Regions:
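Periplasmic polypeptide-binding modules associated with outer-membrane biogenesis and secretion
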Residues: 2-4, 30-236, 242, 247-248, ...
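C-terminal transmembrane beta-barrel domains of outer membrane proteins
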Residues: 31, 402-563
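Transmembrane beta-strand segments that form the barrel wall of outer-membrane beta-barrel proteins
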Residues: 203, 226-236, 247-251, 257-269, ...
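Repeated loop/turn-to-beta-strand initiation elements of outer-membrane beta-barrel proteins
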Residues: 226-228, 255-261, 284-289, 298-299, ...
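Membrane-embedded beta-strand positions of outer-membrane beta-barrel proteins
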Residues: 228-230, 249, 261-265, 289-293, ...
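Transmembrane beta-strands of outer-membrane beta-barrel pores
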Residues: 234-236, 253, 265-269, 293-299, ...
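Outer-membrane beta-barrel proteins
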Residues: 251-255, 277-284, 322-328, 371-382, ...
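Transmembrane beta-strand segments of outer-membrane beta-barrel domains in Gram-negative
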Residues: 288-441
Length: 563
């Protein structure tokens, strides 16, 4: 029996669909504070609205079966269906879908088998894929159903000024592999919308010249990639002056590659630090390489040591390769490999002099290390969780310090960080964060974990003590007391605690435990102004020298403006 089931092109469901994917994403406003980390701060991305609320998409209706066909009352035998062209589903899965339409069937039931294949693709998000029944002669009572899987053959990007169009198209292309899955494409567009270089994306998916072919047109508006910030804080050690003045300038798209360059300068009465970094994307999967260089000069300004002109010069180099493994709208898992090298030289009255057991006779200390980093961030409209793990192996590269008995560049340590945020009500949050460090031997001061002051245990001076092993925790609530469209004022009661110990011949710090309670006052003025004042009350006596600095009284402040 010969049957003519030639479809018109318009009868292939979704082979020529036109859909608008226009949207303007607005992240949920929930500020996730950074986990304190002197090596590599962890910034949690903004929380997102549920994906189904972010994208307005209209699905076209399935076409009617108005094709030239035999008498629909004609009955014939179909033992099986041969589905050709499908790369998504197994033959067993397809056979199960069309099984109800075997045996003694009518032409209408054969069309229903084709529609069942179409529906299977639609239900799984393959909206531009269609099935049809070609003209054929029934052999062995087998009906052939052809599947034309949809694909994007061209991505057109318009509207960009400085950003390379390939930055956008290469990332979206990862979600347009054949067969095209529209929900996956939507999620890729939403993820790209979160990129700080992108302000808005309008997407249009249109029919190509051949069945199954589609053209994706993207109209992109760039975000402002330049940022500058000035801030003041008393977050430095008393010995070099607590009052810090800082300025930083960042260009997030320096050469149009999505490459980020940052230059910052900070100083106190006894210190000057210049920090330069450059990060460039290496692949559409957001592989990045970051290079960082830091140069600092510190001078002791507290009595009676000021007269001795005690100075330290430091240089720090870092090479950071980072690769996200999982990226979705509500979580990210990434791995990183870091090589760092730090060199410090100390002197008294201009003469090189060792100020630690690890330094050589010329006061030089050098540490080289390989670090393996794992980061995981999860966020929802109500919660955010951030985890960071870092394994560090000290190596004797780049003329690193090697000693017989005292701590040197050969070591192993692990540092873990955890942060949890819960949004209880608008602008009302509770935050818990913790940092732990363990090492296999006595460490040089450069690798120890410091505690005290902002970002650690408030109520004690900044960097009050350091140790090889440590555990610190903070519990803080943020409660609004005044807010309007431009300003938000919050109080922040907190509790900080930590315990510390050393390895080998390094004596344990005294005291080994620190704890404090206190109250913070945080103000946010629009998007550019911020200020915070914290007052910490130490619960463990630590023989703190009470001088005229705010820090020695347990008071800490930060004021800043960005533009």
């Amino acid at each position: 029996m010969k049957i003519g089931f030639w479809p018109r092109l318009s009868a292939i469901a979704s082979l020529g669909i036109l859909m608008l994917l226009s949207f303007n994403l607005q992240p949920v406003v929930a500020q996730v504070p950074n986990i304190p980390d002197t090596d590599r701060p962890l910034d949690a991305p903004p929380l997102l609205e549920p994906p189904e609320d972010l994208l307005d998409r209209t699905n076209p209706a399935l076409p009617s079966n108005e094709i030239d066909s035999p008498d629909e009352t004609l009955v014939f035998t179909v033992n099986c269906y041969l589905i050709e062209g499908s790369t998504v589903f197994s033959q067993a899965a397809l056979a199960e879908v069309v099984a109800p339409f075997t045996g003694e069937v009518t032409y209408a039931e054969v069309l229903a088998a084709r529609s069942a294949i179409n529906q299977l693709y639609l239900d799984n998000g393959y909206l531009t894929t269609g099935a049809y029944i070609p003209e054929q002669t029934l052999a062995d009572n087998t009906v052939v159903i052809e599947v034309v899987e949809g694909e994007v053959t061209e991505i057109e990007v318009t509207g960009l000024q400085r950003l390379n169009p390939g930055y956008v198209s290469s990332r979206i292309a990862l979600a347009t592999e054949k067969p095209l899955n529209v929900p996956q494409l939507q999620e890729a567009l939403q993820l790209l919308q979160l990129d700080p270089l992108i302000a808005t994306i309008n997407a249009d998916l249109a029919q190509g010249t051949q069945p199954g072919e589609n053209i994706l047109r993207l109209e992109v508006r760039e975000a402002d990639s330049f940022n500058a910030q000035v801030d003041l804080s008393n977050d430095r050690a008393i010995s070099i002056g607590t009052f810090r003045r800082g300025i930083s300038v960042t260009e997030g798209n320096l050469w149009g590659l999505g490459d980020r360059a940052t230059l910052s300068y900070n100083n106190t009465d006894g210190s000057n630090v210049v920090d330069v970094s450059y990060r460039v994307p290496l692949s559409p999967r957001n592989t990045t390489l970051e290079l960082r260089y830091l140069n600092g000069l510190n001078r002791i300004i507290t009595e009676p040591f000021e007269e001795l002109d005690i100075k330290s010069r430091s240089q720090y180099w870092e090479f950071n390769l980072r690769q996200p493994i999982v990226q979705t709208l509500n979580q990210e898992l990434s791995l990183g490999l870091i090589f760092s090298h730090q060199a410090i030289e100390t002197s008294i009255l201009g003469v090189p002099f060792p100020l630690s057991d690890s330094a050589d006779i010329n006061g030089r200390t050098k540490v080289s290390a390989l670090r393996f980093v794992q980061e995981w961030v999860y966020r929802s409209p109500q919660d955010a969780i951030a985890l960071r793990s870092q394994f560090s192996w000290g190596v004797d590269w780049w003329d690193a310090t090697i000693n017989e008995t005292t701590p040197d560049s050969r070591f192993w340590s692990w540092r873990g960080q955890f942060q949890y945020l819960r949004l209880l009500a608008p602008d009302t949050t509770i935050i818990f964060r913790s940092t732990v460090q363990r090492s296999d031997r006595a460490l040089m001061g450069l690798e120890q974990l410091s505690a005290g002051g902002l970002g650690s245990i408030r109520g004690y001076p900044q960097d009050f003590l350091s140790s090889d092993n440590a555990l610190t925790t903070t519990l803080e609530a943020r409660l609004p007391i005044f807010r309007n469209s431009q300003h938000l004022l919050q109080i922040a009661p907190f509790f900080d605690w930590g315990t510390f110990s050393n390895n080998g011949d390094n004596p344990n710090p005294s005291p080994q435990n620190l704890a404090s309670v206190g109250l913070g006052l945080a103000w946010q003025g629009g998007e550019n102004l911020f200020a915070r004042l914290d007052w910490g009350i130490p619960l463990v006596d630590a023989n703190i020298e009470r001088d005229r600095t705010w820090q020695s009284q347990g008071l800490y402040f930060t004021v800043g403006i960005s533009f």
